[in-house]
Each structure stands twice: as structure tokens, then as C-alpha cells.
């Protein structure tokens, strides 16, 4: 911590670092023109940056330059149990590597506070129509994840600065919003803004509080944990002016789905957005959080709202202390982070969005930014052939387009009391008119916070949700993360026998093909009340705005408009039923300081050799420790646009006929305990078999009878044999054949899944060439020592006529965004040289790549520190 520009914070006993004074010393009048993001980054620099480089770093912000890397020191790291656990497995492996070199393994410790929330490992095996669903699902979670939870328990004692919230307590982002983020820290006599990185792409959820919180991969998080700065160049900071007010009956979900479509078209990938204007100030904190949460879906790195009265009201509502409320307001007003202080902020680009233009929306199929107005269901070819579906139902069959999963799920929506109360009121109204859930619909309610249960009980609305089959099944990510659990065997068999087009409707944030359930061919995102309505309708062929949901006790038809609650009633019940004491009741015991057990544990983990969940990582051994030649590379896959991390390494249930399923069966696991791909990511032998295991993958090399065949397939060269992807990977591993992947635009979008990079690296991939990369996945690739290269505009796999029979070399000096040469050696002997951009974007990224990745970089750093100590 520096000493210059440290001053007393008025009205407190704390000091603060005066970023305004530091900026004004460089350029008078500049601070008032800085966006919110730049002001927070400036404070971070003034407090933490090496004084020798402080002025040059601040000039990047003041002059809006992008020609110098500057450091950012996040205050916290938040993790869920999948990437958080794999990060800690990596650190445990690093301890082993340090010990093998004669070093002290106990020196490997997080320096930055790490908060790990176990929220990703519960599957909805029992739906919300089972009154004992919560207890049953938790028991199954504990049984399946005993190895993982044993390791996580060890980390609490073996590592310093690691706090763990055990399973069954909520979703990391919602807990972060409602409790963990102080907005302003008070530490060692100094007040400063909260900032954090999280091992989940939806970490921007707390941007709604004015906290810079961004999603990173597990590998980048490990770097931050070990106390290293996160180096960056000034991002694009885009102002988004929200005008107007929403129409009656429009939810925050409708708004964010419309914004996601709008912002994707405006190409804000990688940008930090700042929502401002009268429309922004009128939104509740819950509505803001819904918008900030989906930053990765519209491609932004951050989605900031300013600190204002809405922020203070929310902090009060969620049980923060009066002292903390005063600190947040005092600091924000003093440091220029209060909304009124941002009126003169200048942006290089400003977008405008009218909230009054938003209609009732869904998204789908297949992509969150594919907005689907409910008024256009018929014209889009979704709500068609209802007569056919109704006839099938009358014959005792499931209808075409059957909604087999209807889930109120995800931090995106269950952290917003208006959305949850709206769903409960619609359920109450539906029950009053005699409507019911269709029997083939697996319905569930999985709030991200235990406070949701308390305010639903306070409003006496939980019984109405339970009556329609939306009882609470968990406080966890569940269906949104692909953990929707098994279907009723009879329903599943009917889907298989009839090759039925079945769907899912969920209040989640992603609906990529194959993500939600293997037998839900497509999925649609919708607000919580619409999810309830579709459970009643039972088929996506139903025109939710126009068709009759059912008939009441008097034989009268019931339409959606008849049971949709009014805004006035929703707001009245929220105001009456959501109370600070509910949040205190939930979080005070959860975060109570418990006495240390007194038990000491070894600094080295005792790996269980038969475990399929936790295994010593291999990153310091064998081929991964060897040289990457970047020569004679063969393509593992040639891919199109929009390849997601779900394509690269899926999270959902493991099927018996998959490579991972066959491996688990050989290891003695019964099929019902295979669990999900996500839960096995601490064991590389299981997790690497998930690489490209998505059945919806389209690898353009997998040509069978003249047609590209969909599935987890690859073509072994030079034989030209199309086989299962894992068979190709094993073949190339045996041959020690270095590999390359060729892809289209937006490669790696979706979850911040480090195994999407680890899997391809373990397969032998050294290079990925694409038309564009999503930010988090690109940094994960670098963190694993995989070189990301980008085609120049107008050049791609199609213009070059690439078919996978080629071999490739990469020539040139690897420097930030340098032009390198991709040499294409065609089968006919022709040699083509293609200029490509090296997507190592900073000197730090070059250093990490050249070291072989984050873990080798960290090992070198720790060993050099030991040598000079």
C-alpha cells in the first residue's frame, strides 16, 4: 500500500486514497470527465501501483490510451465449487511440484482472500412436486460428491485465506450481492472500493452495486490468488443511456433479454458498460442485478451501475449495518462515485436504449441473444400445430414440443424479489382457477438465496408454488448449470421411442443446445412467471399470449392475461414481505466465525488413487512440461462460428455410452452416480474425456457419405478415418502428434470454464486459430500455454479452403498483438503463408505463455523467490 495521496475520509476515523488529487495533478479538470470504471481503477492504482510507474499508468486512464499495461489488484476472489475446487486442486498440485524441487509446500497459499461457495454440484433428481425434494437432493449431492467435499474440507485448514460456504446455502453471485460485498471496504484504517474477480462468467452480478466484479477463468483466478496483479490495458468503456420506463406487466427478465439482443448487435464484446440516465436510476437494485448478471451473454466484461439511493436502500434491505451504509455513502460522495458526480463523465461511445420499447420476451432456441417476443411465437414457427399436439395429448401421449423441464432457477432471476413474487402470484391465480401442471413437466424452484424461502413464506405464497409443482428443490445453480437431473424413466423412454421434439423453459441465463438436458433438444429462457405458465401449457407449441391455458371451475376459458398479476400487487407484496431481518437470519449464522478445530493437516494432500473426482494434476509432467514446437500441427477440428465452452467441455449429465461414462463404469461407479461432467473436473482422467463431448458439435472434418455429421466426432489424419472424438485424441496422444484447431467467430463464448482450455491442451493442442475469441476463454488458453491466433479481417477457413487434411506451422516472434505467419501445408504439396494476429495482448500474457501457462509461471515465480530469499 502506498502513502502518497492518503487523506482522512470526512466524518470517519478512516483514511482514503484521493484519486481525484492524483489525476488532477496530471491534468486539471480531468477527473470529472472520467467514467465510473476509470475512477475506481485510478484509486486502485494510487493505492497499490508501484510509484515509479504510477503516473504513466494514470495517463492511460486520463488520456484514454491503450499502449501500456497497468496493474489491477482485486480485493477478493470468489469461487464456486467447480472452478474454485479445480483452482485449489491446481494449487495443491503446485505444492507437490514445489516439494519435489525441495521447496516448502506451505509457502503456496492464496494471498488475496478467497471465498468458495459450494453451489454447482447439486442435480435436481427429485422435482418440485415431491415434498421431500430438498432433503433427497441434498443427500444425493453429499453421497456423489464425498471425494470432492473431502478435498474442499482439507483446503479450509491447509490453505490460508480460504473461506468455504458449504452446500445447500445458495448461489455464489446472490450471496455476493446480498452479503459478501461490502461495496466499500474498511481495512487497516483505509476505506477503498470493493473489487473482485470470480471463477464464473456471471460474476458481474454485483456490478449492480457499483462494484467492479468480472468473471475470469480458474487459471487467471489462481494468478490473482497468489497475489499477482491482473494486468490490463484500458478497456473500451461504453455508456448505455437508459431512457423511458417499462410498460405494465414487463419484468426485468424481459428487459435483459431485449438488452442482450441489442448489445450483441452493438458489438460490446470485452467492453465495460456503464448504465446511466433516468431509466437506470428508476430501476430497483434487483432489476439492475438481473441486467448486470447477463453481461457475458451480451459479451461485455462488466455492466456497471452507479452508487445511489437505490444502492443504499438495497444494502439496508439486505441487512447491512447502519455503519456500513454510512461508510458507502460517505465514501462514494467524497470519491466521486455517487451517481450525481458522474453527470459530466465522457465516453468514447454512448448507446441509447428505451425501456418503454420492451415487450414480453423469451429467448431461444439455442442462444440467449436470440430474443423471441411472446407476440411472435407463431410467426417464428414456434407456436404451430397446437391441434396436433393437443390430439397427441388426448391419446395419452406427450405432445410435440413437450416442455419436459420448467425451472425457476439461476441467480439472474431469483435474486430479484419482483420476479419471484410475480411467479408466486401467477401460481396463486392459476390455482384459484383450477389450472394444473402437465404431468410430464419436471418443475422446480431453486432460489439462489435462502432468504427467498423466508419472504415467500411471509407472503403466504410458497404453498401456491408447491401446489403447482414448484416446491423448493435446492438453494443452488441446478438446472441453469445443466444439473436438471434425470427424467422419469417412462417419460425418457417415450422421448427416445418417438424421437420426440422435447424442450425446456427456464429462468436461467443460457440455453445453448444440449446444455440443459440431453433429451431437451432446445431450451427457452423466460421470466419466472412465464416458466410457471409453460408448466401449465405443457408444450412450446402453445401460443402463450393467445391460446387457452385451460378452463376454470365454471367452464370459462383461462388465458395468460387472466392470471398475470398487476405491477401494483407485485410491488405491494414485495414492500410488505421482503424484510432485512430475513437476510440477517440467513447470513449471520452462515458467516459466523467458528472456533478453529485445532486439527492440523498436512500441507500436501493425500491423493486418493481410485478417485474419479480429485487427482494430482499432470501439468508439470510429461508432454505438458515439454517444448511446444508449433510445427507440423494437425487439425483436431475445423469449426464454425459461436463455438461455446459447452461445446468444448460440457457440464451436464454423463451418459453411459460416452467416453467419460465408459471410463467411470470401468472404475466401478454405478450409472446413477456418474454425476455431471462439471463435478469430475478435479480428476483430469475423467475431465479430459469431456473434451468436445457435446453431441451437438459440428466438426467440419467429420464428413460421412459426403455430409458433415453432427456429434462428438473427429477425423484422424492422414488416414481420413472419422471416429469418436476421444478415440482421435487418444490416437494423436499415442503418436505424440501436436494439434491445432481452426474456428470461426466468437470462439469460446459462454461459461468461464478452464477445462475448455485444459482439455484441448491435454489433447495436445498447441494453437487455436479463429476469427475472434471471447475474453475469458482466450485468457484461459494462454493460462494453459495454448497460443491463440486470429485471422485478419476478410480471411477465414472458408476463404482459404481449409478441410483438415493440411498440416500447419507458426512462424514469427510472439509479442503483444504482433503479426505472425500461419503456414498452411496442403496435402498436394502447396504451401500458403497466412498473416494472423497473435492474441497475446499484453507483455504479461506473453510471459505466461512462454512459461508454459499460469501454473508453470507461478512455479517459476515461487522458486525464484525462494532462491533470492
Swiss-Prot record:
Transmembrane segments: none annotated. Its cofactor is [4Fe-4S] cluster. Binds 1 [4Fe-4S] cluster per subunit. It is an enzyme of class 4 (lyase). It comes from the Bacteria. Pfam families: Aconitase, Aconitase_C. Involved in the catabolism of short chain fatty acids (SCFA) via the tricarboxylic acid (TCA)(acetyl degradation route) and the 2-methylcitrate cycle I (propionate degradation route). Catalyzes the reversible isomerization of citrate to isocitrate via cis-aconitate. Could catalyze the hydration of 2-methyl-cis-aconitate to yield (2S,3R)-2-methylisocitrate. The apo form of AcnA functions as a RNA-binding regulatory protein. This is Aconitate hydratase A. It comes from Cupriavidus necator (Alcaligenes eutrophus).
Amino acid at each position: 500500500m502506498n502513502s502518497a495521496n492518503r487523506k482522512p475520509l470526512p466524518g470517519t476515523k478512516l483514511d482514503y486514497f484521493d484519486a481525484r488529487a492524483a489525476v488532477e495533478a496530471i491534468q486539471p479538470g480531468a477527473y470529472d470527465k472520467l467514467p465510473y470504471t476509470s475512477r475506481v481503477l485510478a484509486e486502485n492504482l494510487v493505492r497499490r501501483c508501484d510509484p515509479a510507474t504510477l503516473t504513466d499508468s494514470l495517463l492511460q486512464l486520463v488520456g484514454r490510451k491503450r499502449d501500456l499495461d497497468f496493474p489491477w489488484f482485486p480485493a477478493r476472489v470468489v469461487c464456486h465449487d467447480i472452478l474454485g475446487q479445480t483452482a485449489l486442486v491446481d494449487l495443491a498440485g503446485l505444492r507437490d511440484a514445489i516439494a519435489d524441487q525441495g521447496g516448502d509446500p506451505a509457502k503456496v497459499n492464496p494471498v488475496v482472500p478467497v471465498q468458495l461457495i459450494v453451489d454447482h454440484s447439486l442435480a435436481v433428481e427429485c422435482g418440485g412436486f415431491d415434498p421431500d425434494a430438498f432433503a433427497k437432493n441434498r443427500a444425493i449431492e453429499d453421497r456423489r460428491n464425498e471425494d470432492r467435499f473431502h478435498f474442499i474440507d482439507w483446503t479450509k485448514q491447509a490453505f490460508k485465506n480460504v473461506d468455504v460456504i458449504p452446500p445447500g446455502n445458495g448461489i455464489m453471485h446472490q450471496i455476493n450481492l446480498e452479503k459478501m460485498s461490502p461495496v466499500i471496504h474498511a481495512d487497516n484504517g483505509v476505506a477503498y472500493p470493493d473489487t473482485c474477480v470470480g471463477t464464473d462468467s456471471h460474476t458481474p452480478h454485483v456490478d449492480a452495486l457499483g462494484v467492479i466484479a468480472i468473471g475470469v477463468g480458474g487459471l487467471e483466478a489462481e494468478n490473482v490468488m497468489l497475489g499477482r496483479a491482473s494486468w490490463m490495458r484500458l478497456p473500451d468503456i461504453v455508456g448505455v443511456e437508459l431512457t423511458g420506463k417499462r410498460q405494465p406487466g414487463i419484468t426485468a427478465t424481459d428487459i435483459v433479454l431485449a438488452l442482450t439482443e441489442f448489445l450483441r448487435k452493438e458489438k460490446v464484446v470485452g467492453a465495460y458498460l456503464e448504465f446511466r440516465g433516468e431509466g437506470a436510476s428508476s430501476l430497483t437494485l434487483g432489476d439492475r442485478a438481473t441486467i448486470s448478471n447477463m453481461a457475458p451473454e451480451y459479451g461485455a466484461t462488466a455492466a456497471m451501475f452507479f452508487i445511489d439511493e437505490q444502492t443504499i436502500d438495497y444494502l439496508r434491505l439486505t441487512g447491512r449495518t447502519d455503519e456500513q451504509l454510512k461508510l458507502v455513502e460517505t465514501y462514494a460522495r467524497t470519491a466521486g462515485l455517487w451517481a450525481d458526480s458522474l453527470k459530466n463523465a465522457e465516453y468514447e461511445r454512448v448507446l441509447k436504449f428505451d425501456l418503454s420499447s420492451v415487450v414480453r420476451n423469451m429467448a431461444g432456441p439455442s442462444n440467449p441473444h436470440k430474443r423471441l417476443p411472446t407476440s411472435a411465437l407463431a410467426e417464428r414457427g414456434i407456436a404451430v400445430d397446437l391441434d396436433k399436439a393437443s390430439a397427441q395429448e388426448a391419446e395419452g401421449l406427450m405432445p410435440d414440443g413437450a416442455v419436459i423441464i420448467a425451472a425457476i432457477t439461476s441467480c439472474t432471476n431469483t435474486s430479484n424479489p419482483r420476479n419471484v413474487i410475480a411467479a408466486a402470484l401467477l401460481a396463486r391465480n392459476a390455482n384459484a382457477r383450477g389450472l394444473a401442471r402437465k404431468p410430464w413437466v419436471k418443475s422446480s424452484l431453486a432460489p439462489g438465496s435462502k432468504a427467498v424461502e423466508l419472504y415467500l413464506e411471509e407472503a403466504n405464497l410458497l404453498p401456491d408454488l408447491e401446489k403447482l409443482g414448484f416446491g423448493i428443490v435446492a438453494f443452488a445453480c441446478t438446472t441453469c448449470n445443466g444439473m436438471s437431473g434425470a427424467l422419469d424413466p417412462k417419460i425418457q423412454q417415450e422421448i427416445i421411442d418417438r424421437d420426440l421434439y422435447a424442450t425446456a423453459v427456464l429462468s436461467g441465463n443460457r440455453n445453448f443446445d444440449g446444455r440443459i438436458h440431453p433429451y431437451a433438444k432446445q431450451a427457452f429462457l423466460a421470466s419466472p412467471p412465464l416458466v410457471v405458465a409453460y408448466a401449465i401449457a405443457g408444450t412450446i407449441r402453445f401460443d402463450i399470449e393467445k391460446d387457452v391455458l385451460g378452463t376454470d371451475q365454471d367452464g370459462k376459458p383461462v388465458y395468460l392475461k387472466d392470471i398475470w398479476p398487476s405491477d401494483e400487487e407485485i410491488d405491494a407484496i414485495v414492500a410488505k414481505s421482503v424484510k432485512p431481518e430475513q437476510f440477517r437470519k440467513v447470513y449471520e449464522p452462515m458467516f459466523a466465525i467458528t472456533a478453529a478445530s485445532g486439527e492440523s493437516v498436512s500441507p500436501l494432500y493425500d491423493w486418493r488413487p481410485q478417485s474419479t473426482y480429485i487427482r494430482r494434476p499432470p501439468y508439470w509432467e510429461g508432454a505438458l512440461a515439454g517444448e511446444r514446437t508449433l510445427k507440423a500441427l494437425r487439425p483436431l477440428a475445423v469449426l464454425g462460428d459461436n463455438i461455446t465452452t459447452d461445446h468444448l467441455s460440457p457440464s451436464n449429465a454423463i451418459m453411459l455410452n460416452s467416453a467419460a461414462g465408459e471410463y467411470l463404469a470401468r472404475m466401478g461407479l454405478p450409472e446413477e452416480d456418474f454425476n455431471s461432467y462439471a463435478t469430475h473436473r478435479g480428476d483430469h482422467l475423467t475431465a479430459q474425456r469431456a473434451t468436445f463431448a457435446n453431441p451437438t458439435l459440428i466438426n467440419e472434418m467429420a464428413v460421412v457419405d459426403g455430409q458433415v455429421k453432427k456429434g462428438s466426432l473427429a477425423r484422424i489424419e492422414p488416414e481420413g478415418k472419422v471416429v469418436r472424438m476421444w478415440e482421435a485424441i487418444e490416437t494423436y496422444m499415442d503418436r505424440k502428434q501436436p494439434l491445432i484447431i481452426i474456428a470461426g467467430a466468437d470462439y469460446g463464448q459462454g461459461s468461464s470454464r478452464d477445462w475448455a482450455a485444459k482439455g484441448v491442451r491435454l489433447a495436445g493442442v498447441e494453437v487455436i486459430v479463429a476469427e475472434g475469441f471471447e475474453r475469458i476463454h482466450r485468457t484461459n488458453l494462454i493460462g494453459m500455454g495454448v497460443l491463440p491466433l486470429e485471422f485478419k479481417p476478410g480471411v477465414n477457413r472458408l476463404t482459404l479452403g481449409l478441410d483438415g487434411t493440411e498440416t500447419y506451422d507458426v512462424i514469427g516472434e510472439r509479442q503483444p498483438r504482433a503479426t505472425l505467419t500461419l503456414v498452411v501445408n496442403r496435402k498436394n504439396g502447396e504451401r500458403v503463408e497466412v498473416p494472423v494476429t497473435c492474441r497475446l495482448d499484453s507483455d504479461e500474457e506473453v510471459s505466461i505463455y512462454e512459461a508454459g501457462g499460469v501454473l508453470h509461471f507461478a512455479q517459476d515465480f515461487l522458486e525464484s523467490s525462494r532462491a533470492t530469499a
